[in-house]
Amino acid sequence: ARLFKKHGIEFIVNSSFSKRNQEEIPKVYKLAKELGATAWYMFMIVPTGRGEEIMNELISKEAYEEILEWHYQMEKDEKDMLVRPTCAPHYYRVVLQKSKEEGAKFEKRTLKFSTGGAKGCIAGQLICLIDVDGNVLPCSYFPKPAGNIRQQSFKDIWENSELFRELRDFKKYKGKCGSCEYINVCGGCRARSYSIHGDYLE
């Protein structure tokens, strides 16, 4: 990071957090700022892939909420570095609630090449992933493919696959997400739902 800064190369700091290091979040933010990062992205672990092995280390719901509220206050005051909690779609619910309580407009900033920053989960809505075998997935955390580009066109998969169509239809969502007034700005993490409930609409 210091070499990047020395040579005028912009860089981003990505950090992943679980129970074992959640207390370090403010310190990591401060370090990224001191290093001169263009952006700091706080990744909240999604329990898929290797993340399944540390399911018991996921941050509790209560602590998660406190961290997102801390991020909201920090982001309001942060002028030099772009910041965003990644794979934490309910942050956008926190932003709306807090800004409404305070009677203030929240200015969201993002990188010029970023796909996110305006709403919660965009998997299968604005982005997707094509793996080395041609499988088309909603995001890098979501293990269920919507189709394969070796068998059908990407356009057909993107527009017509059952998986993508369901992800875009909030009326099909179940459980707390399905009845939440903030579903349109949050959407919940579908990969997290699939991992925990076995149903990406739950």
Ranges and model annotations:
Residues 135-136, 140-202:
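Flexible mid-to-C-terminal extensions adjoining Fe-S/redox cofactors in radical SAM and related proteins
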Residues 126-127, 177:
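Short hydrophobic/aromatic beta-strand element in the GNAT-like acyltransferase core
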Residues 1-123, 129-133, 145:
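Radical SAM enzyme [4Fe-4S]-AdoMet core and its adjacent flexible, acidic
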